[in-house]
């Protein structure tokens, strides 16, 4: 009697076979992000049961909110500035000492985004958040509802705001971004807000709207205001104004824990290292031992992953790119009753998107200096994720750095997408196409 042949499949394939897809858009998004997330989770030694748990979460709660898949004829239905080519999602790998964590971030999008049914992409963000809140036991609405009230556009103002819309503005003005940390204990959700549309409505500068939305609610944010004041003082300084450094986003942990983080993001279009370092230290306002060590390590990492010669002037900007969000970002973690913001720099390695080898080499040199991070072969990690038959299938978008007694580095990845003919997205028996 012959033994039946086993038909084994990977976790992301098993989920697809068991549940199918609502439409071809979801099928194609899963073909891109399903195997990528599975590889990341396996590389980070997540138990198989936890891999299924997190893949199932992405499948049910994020996949339906990635929007229409790009077509050959029309590209993206809602093209954001979230990545250089408009892809609305990315994955990331965080190295916190020897601990490694997988993450996924995306702009919530639907077929109605940009239409009269959802002109600012707000309704889909609310729908997504309701879905997440119904699943995550520690989700809290307090901060989210506050920022919806202060940042979202009320329906009566829609026509006025659209009439004032500048060219290319929709790509820049992402009303909401959703971040998810895939942790051992579950999923941590981090909504992101900006005030660009609200600035169009009110005529108030968007960075002022961001700071005011926090400062004006002492009931929710009183414990965070001393740290916020340090950031505001820097933004009002002559140096920050000279470098055109301004507030651009805010984010937070949507959890009920008492030490939930509030994050404020600054953006600078001028990419000379000295300007980034100035923001990292908030013009010298931050000078504790972590900052002093962090500055030294930041410079090494910046020069390594951007493949800059050691004598490249710190006062010279990097080459311009066609990325609408070109420049750098720094976010500052604010914790309750802690007057010291904790900075994290986003290094814009996407300017070297044709030179992934230098980025990989620069990261490995950094990891080799910090053996406690336990990254012996970063090239193998990157090639496992993004090398198919010797052809790269993704790029590094950002590398982030902070220092908290040890280096804290995150690699953000954008997979390549292949647009399909529109006819391939026509409705049919989609569930039968779930392999």
UniProtKB/Swiss-Prot annotation:
It holds the Pfam family Trp_DMAT. Induction: The onset of expression occurs at 60-hour-old stationary cultures and the steady-state levels correlates with the onset of aflatrem biosynthesis at 108 hours. Expression is regulated by nsdC. Substrate binds at residues 103, 190, 261, 263, 265, 346, 413. L-tryptophan binds at residues 81-82, 90. Keywords: Transferase. Disulfide bonds: none annotated. GO terms for biological process: alkaloid metabolic process. GO terms for molecular function: transferase activity, transferring alkyl or aryl (other than methyl) groups. Its EC number is 2.5.1.-. It is an enzyme of class 2 (transferase). Indole diterpene prenyltransferase; part of the ATM2 gene cluster that mediates the biosynthesis of aflatrem, a tremorgenic mycotoxin with acute neurotoxic effects. Synthesis of geranylgeranyl diphosphate (GGPP) by AtmG (a GGPP synthase) precedes condensation of GGPP with indole 3-glycerol phosphate, followed by epoxidation and cyclization by AtmM (a FAD-dependent monooxygenase) and AtmC (a prenyltransferase) to produce paspaline. AtmB is also essential for paspaline production, but its exact role has not been identified yet. Belongs to the tryptophan dimethylallyltransferase family. NCBIfam families: arom_pren_DMATS. This is Indole diterpene prenyltransferase atmD.
